[in-house]
């Protein structure tokens, strides 16, 4: 028995020594690792984490708005277990929000139908079972005061708050409903204090007794916002909003995350251009935010995805960009400085560096459209360009670039808007295409 104990102790010491050696030889890699894929591609879904389980609810797959849900348990090493399907929503919905409180998940607002034109006021509730699966969804008796596509939610003082979004016009209003002891919601009321500005396709996160509203879509121009505002979640229900340190990058369709006293703004769009940039800031005791700084970017530019943080890991779920809709899941660690990456071997670092170099040296892909610049109108955020293509002409708009009449340019596919009115220019275009990329022909 003594010899057996000695052997076990020796093996334990060897294991500890090996682990310490491996950690000493590990290198920090500023990148992302692949995790288990979802069953369905999803953008505009609601993604949240509850007790080590990630839930992906609703969204759009590029063709249809979804009523399906799925979930995955986070393993001890940060990897995700295979995704499992769970209870379906009563209403297919995308560009909505969902939050958890006391074992219930609440899903509110959003849109459905062609281009999300059917705006939703309804709220659904489900209970999380002991296995992590969702039980059947129940549609709440009381609906929100306003339909809100791209609504954002948070819980404070046993009330569910809904803010911003689109109801035929962009909203700055806030409303809330009491959460009853059985999990059901009471009647919604409009809050006295609105946001400091309209908010649409923005992000919201609660952090250490404060709620933050981050970015969004500018009301008078199709660009992102840098503005951030916050409120203290006081016990008297009176929420007063004020602005704090803005981000460096304007963005809408972004996601966000929190870790400790750090707040992250992730990806999104500015104009028609997708972003892979991630910024991080630190929260002060009074809720004010410090200067934002850049950290490791996403593995690809994307918007309308989900992000969650659990322990020291951050996860990116689904989303979309010009290449399509994603069912991928990626994860990374957060170090003591708040930077994003993972610990790996020297070989993994070299492989990562080669991959990044290959991206930079990859030849530019020829864009599908081209023409000659016939007219240019510049605004702070956009270049509006009348392009001559043989005997036809087309107005396009993209992120501000310096072009001259007579230049030959090429540009990507985009989103065509009929009877588009630019408030900045006080002008209506019969037809205009918003494009992500435009450049001079080499």
Task: Show where each model-derived region lies.
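Bacterial N-terminal signal peptides that target proteins for export
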Residues: 1-8
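Kelch-like beta-propeller repeat domains
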Residues: 20-356
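Structural detector for short beta-strands of small beta-barrel domains
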Residues: 364-379
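Flexible glycine-rich surface loops and low-complexity tracts that mediate binding to linear polymers
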Residues: 406-422
